[in-house]
Amino acid sequence: MKGNFLWKKWGSILCCLGVIGGCFLHTAWRGEDAIFPMMDAVIVLDAGHGGWDPGRKGTAGVDEKELNLAVVEKLADYLEQGGAEVILTRESDDALGGKKQSDMAERKKIANESGADILVSIHQNAFPSPKAKGAQVFYHNNSGNGKVLAECVQESLRSRVDGSNQRQAKENKDYYILRTTEIPAVIVECGFLSNAEEERLLNDDTYQEKLAWAIYCGILDYFEKSSII
């Protein structure tokens, strides 16, 4: 992923200069560390679903699993360029098990054996009402650091992607990946595939870059607040 990042992403980065500039200014106080602000961080990125499990299906037929992996790949590029070690639960359109239970158990195993600082799981939302929209971040109700991470990412998504999004980071006690991982973990629902306009945006490469950058900046804000790295 690292080799040709600047060339491969240049066009999309130009489109995101406004939000990018804001995040670099946010880290400038760290001096030369701002060149690699994620140095020493280890992060697990989980692209939800995959293979036989397509996840949600959009109004135009887009499979959630494809969008999840696309955002994860872009986010991984940003994190690695920032100096982080990134561990992916999947790198292609493959499930991690033949059934949902074994698939989720393998994701948990990867996270818990990784020695990582955090886990970020990327998903897309859906709702019966086609009007529902906006990214939202979930954390486990018993994870204090998970809450801080979720709030940092939620605020970054609001300020860098959609200022009209009034959704707040939300606790959840039932999501498997949140309740079984031993490190701070969040699920980022990037938007609603049940909303035709938001589905169109989520399927757009430049918008995916914008989402990935906002999540990256939220993660960086978390590490600055927690002083983990």
Per-region residue spans from a language model:
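Catalytic-site microenvironment of enzymes
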Residues: 1-229
